[in-house]
Amino acid sequence: MSARRSAIFVNTTDTAVANLVVFEVPAGTAIGAAMRELDLPNKGPEAIVCAKDAEGQLKDLSHVPETTATFTAVPANTDDGRAVIRHSCAHVLAQAVQAEFPGTKLGIGPAIENGFYYDFDAAEPFTPEDLKTIEKRMKKIIKTGQKFERRVYESAEAAAEELKNEPYKLELIQDKGNVDPNSDEATEVGAGELTAYDNVNPRTSEVEWSDLCRGPHIPTTRYIPAFALTRSSAAYWRGDQDNAGLQRIYGTAWEDKESLDAYQTMLAEAEKRDHRRLGTELDLFSFPDDLGSGLPVFHPNGGIVRNEMEDHSRRRHIAAGYSFVNTPHITKQDLFERSGHLGFYKDGMFPPMQVDAEFDEDGNVTKPGQEYYLKPMNCPMHNLIFDSRGRSYRELPLRLFEFGNVYRYEKSGVIHGLTRARGFTQDDAHIYCTEDQLEAELTSVLDFILSLLRDYGLDDFYLELSTRDPKKSVGSDEIWERSTEILNRVATNSGLELVPDPEGAAFYGPKISVQARDAIGRTWQMSTVQLDFNMPERFNLEYTSSDGSKQQPIMIHRALFGSIERFFGVLLEHYAGAFPAWLAPHQVMGIPVADDCIPHLETITAQLREKGIRADVDTSDDRMQKKIRNHTTGKVPFMLLAGARDVEANAVSFRFLDGTQVNGVPVDEAIAVISSWIGDRINDQPSEDSIAARR
């Protein structure tokens, strides 16, 4: 029976492939065999590397369905295709490491965003020279065209016997069935059969190497056209610092060399923009060891930027009808039991504190203490504010907002500067409304989010819709279906691209997340809008409706920046340290040609300060050119130069970060230009051309 082919349009984030091929595979026929009649590519960036079944599960091309089934061809230049290539490349990496460093034990090796990694228990840390050696071995393996062949173990005991010299694999086999399906370990074991993948020599049919793995994989190693190892680091087995220390090697793999080159160029640019490095260079923030991991402090320069961010957000929220509240950092255990957080989120919370216990003179407890927790979220406390008095339908929608400090226990291996911290400030809102108001309020909230993000210079967005994880959720099927349908409609009506995130929602409701692309094309999750029919019920929240009956409000969780710290880090990298003038810690710096020009510049900067502009004069002993270099490095958007002619003409010269200059601008005009540029919150850096256009 021949495979039947039909082309359908698929809503996808993959720009290279919008039209994917759907075909039918007869029972007892391998997918790859059925696909041969379709004349689909097996080389190049559109080579078909695997297939997707009707349930969305990826399958090897060697997979043989028991009944006739429909599959979608998955090209290399799609997100799914790249993920399979990267996971297969991780296997090649592990094979190469064990060949070059005999005795090395295997951890896990999943595909991750833009790449892959593999963890190893090695005798010594891997050096840059080691990575070069490993890369050479990998290229040899790829060139031989080894086949990836799936093999099912007869039993867990059979797998354990085969892998008896791989202690980490043995642990995974023992844990089969208890592994989080969303964890990296699920790459190796999970639901279904216990399987291995053998790397088979195509000439001799001998197994060159094998690994415990669920798959799927590419047909042969030749389907890895472009890869690179990027770095090595220390890691803990299963991400737990109480476990064994391992060595992790990271790599990336792509559908062609051009894509790899583009990614490596982006990586080099991202390294220059790393907010941790820029934070030190620009004296914005630090992470003192005395405080502990993931706990930042903001220096005066960073404090200015942060305050400007918060102040603008505060003004916009007030104008949009939000009411500001404030809640404490800790609370009794009972509140988080009531909210459900202890049942569903305890692993992400810091351990409790014992407070108010009483003891006799011998140290015996006479009155047990009360357990308190650092809050990981603000929503339970906002519910208490709503419930502090009777509410009328006339008060709804009620929009409560705060810059609330929260604390979440993140494993040390995932902490990353400001973008993944343990203590941070959420710009957190909770909106209580009626069911009739819900869709309009969600639409208004999403519009407000996008408008405010654009104020800070982000304007390339798409949306993700996260839906229910049946294993981690509360509430009825009906409530989840209804809330998901409403969110989907609001997201679709926004006109932005909508990407599904199956089972990605929190336990209390589905959510929309706003994803923003930065100046170099990276994607950052920004805002979240989460619908919650459940928590109002847990807190018995009520309002009096127009007919006098008591009704339960619907609750919307909304974090716009995600966190102030994270948004700060994203903007810092987006602008490569050169914040827009309205956010910059130092907005104007006067640079005299000679000391006798200092009074002239001090008069100008004094007038600017009266207008609320951050302006200073560099009176150091450095020469003028060094001062220009220093303040260019310091990302000051307006540098004002003054020499004898400027003093005589009551003028000043502009110097900009791009090296351009505008000379002899009358002082009143210069002040007006700077004031309007900052007052209008223009996010572009000023330059000769842009200033000329405003004169």
Swiss-Prot record:
What PANTHER family does this protein's entry cite?
Answer: THREONINE--TRNA LIGASE, CHLOROPLASTIC_MITOCHONDRIAL 2, THREONINE-TRNA LIGASE
Its recorded reaction(s) are: tRNA(Thr) + L-threonine + ATP = L-threonyl-tRNA(Thr) + AMP + diphosphate + H(+)
UniProt cross-references to InterPro entries, sorted A to Z: aa-tRNA-synt_IIb, aa-tRNA-synth_II, aa-tRNA-synth_II/BPL/LPL, Anticodon-bd, Anticodon-bd_dom_sf, TGS, Thr-tRNA-ligase_IIa, Thr/Ala-tRNA-synth_IIc_edit
In the record, the note on similarity to other proteins reads: Belongs to the class-II aminoacyl-tRNA synthetase family.
SMART domains on file: tRNA_SAD
The record's keywords, sorted A to Z, are: Aminoacyl-tRNA synthetase, ATP-binding, Cytoplasm, Ligase, Metal-binding, Nucleotide-binding, Protein biosynthesis, RNA-binding, tRNA-binding, Zinc
UniProt cross-references to Gene3D superfamilies, sorted A to Z: 3.30.54.20, Anticodon-binding domain (3.40.50.800), Bira Bifunctional Protein, Domain 2 (3.30.930.10), Threonyl-trna Synthetase, Chain A, domain 2 (3.30.980.10)
Q: Which gene produces this protein?
A: thrS
Q: Where does Zn(2+) bind?
A: 379, 430, 557
Subunit structure and binding partners: Homodimer.
- Could you say which EC number(s) this protein's record lists? 6.1.1.3
Q: Which cofactor does it need?
A: Zn(2+)
> By its UniProt entry, which SUPFAM superfamilies does this protein fall under?
Class II aaRS ABD-related, Class II aaRS and biotin synthetases, ThrRS/AlaRS common domain
Please tell me the species this chain comes from: Corynebacterium glutamicum (strain ATCC 13032 / DSM 20300 / JCM 1318 / BCRC 11384 / CCUG 27702 / LMG 3730 / NBRC 12168 / NCIMB 10025 / NRRL B-2784 / 534)
Q: Tell me the protein's name.
A: Threonine--tRNA ligase
Q: Name one GO molecular function term.
A: threonine-tRNA ligase activity
